[in-house]
């Protein structure tokens, strides 16, 4: 039995990671423009260490019933050249396109991110229903957003929590039930994303095993989780509300 267990573990480790979604499949869902005005939306935050990339994603349901999505990244302003060299991409191009924001100095300015989030309703003409976040590095920001009148929900980045949203996002893309506007940085994040399986065979995006930055994909999965719970499953009680 021990031999079989060890043998199975070896096999399992051999197929531990796999590509999440092919970029070519994601690109099939690209549209020229999304009409956000009047939509109810859910936000997902992935606030990593202040020296690393952070991301905010917004999702909702379009008039055609498809999931509509937008995602932006935040990086330390004084580390642009360093990150360009290390990651072999041009962050200045993404900043010019409005899909990435450089803030702070050597570290990301959380206050900038908080202000950005608080301006989303006015900028897009949407109504923010909920904001999902992971407790790690985000508790202070979540409390500030709560004080500003937003409903924030802690969404643990565990496979047992996010596997359903991970699957929904994948299936929505593969079935062309997903739309996003031109966003090269998001596509790069999807290209970097690698998945693993938990002991219960729950599939999840594995940051440590991924081939580069995946913060935009992770924040989108968190937002999709809220959308799934509220719209597709109709559940009202979930997560841990902060307040």
Question: Can you say where each PLM-predicted feature lies in the sequence?
Answer:
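RNase H-like, metal-dependent nuclease domains and their acidic two-metal-ion catalytic environment used
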Residues: 1-157, 163, 167, 180, ...
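Short, surface-exposed amphipathic charged segments that create phosphate/polyanion-binding patches used
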Residues: 166-175
């Amino acid at each position: 039995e021990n031999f079989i267990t060890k043998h199975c573990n070896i096999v399992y480790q051999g197929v531990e990671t796999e590509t999440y979604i092919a970029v070519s499949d994601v690109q099939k869902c690209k549209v020229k423009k999304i009409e956000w005005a009047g939509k109810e939306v859910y936000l997902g935050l992935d606030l990593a260490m202040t020296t690393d990339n952070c991301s905010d994603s917004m999702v909702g349901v379009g008039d055609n019933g498809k999931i509509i999505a937008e995602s932006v990244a935040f990086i330390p302003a004084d580390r642009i050249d360093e990150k360009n060299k290390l990651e072999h991409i041009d962050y200045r191009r993404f900043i010019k396109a409005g899909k990435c924001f450089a803030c702070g100095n050597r570290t990301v300015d959380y206050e900038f991110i908080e202000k950005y989030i608080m301006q989303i309703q006015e900028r897009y003409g949407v109504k923010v229903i909920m904001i999902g976040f992971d407790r790690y590095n985000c508790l202070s920001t979540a409390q500030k957003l709560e004080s500003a009148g937003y409903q924030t929900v802690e969404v643990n980045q565990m496979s047992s929590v996010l596997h359903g949203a991970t699957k929904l996002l994948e299936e929505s893309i593969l079935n062309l039930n997903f739309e996003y506007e031109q966003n090269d940085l998001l596509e790069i994040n999807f290209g970097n994303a690698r998945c693993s399986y938990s002991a219960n065979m729950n599939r999840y995006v594995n940051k440590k095993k991924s081939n580069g930055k995946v913060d935009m994909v992770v924040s989108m999965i968190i937002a999709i989780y809220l959308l799934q719970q509220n719209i597709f499953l109709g559940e009202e009680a979930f997560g841990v509300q902060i307040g």
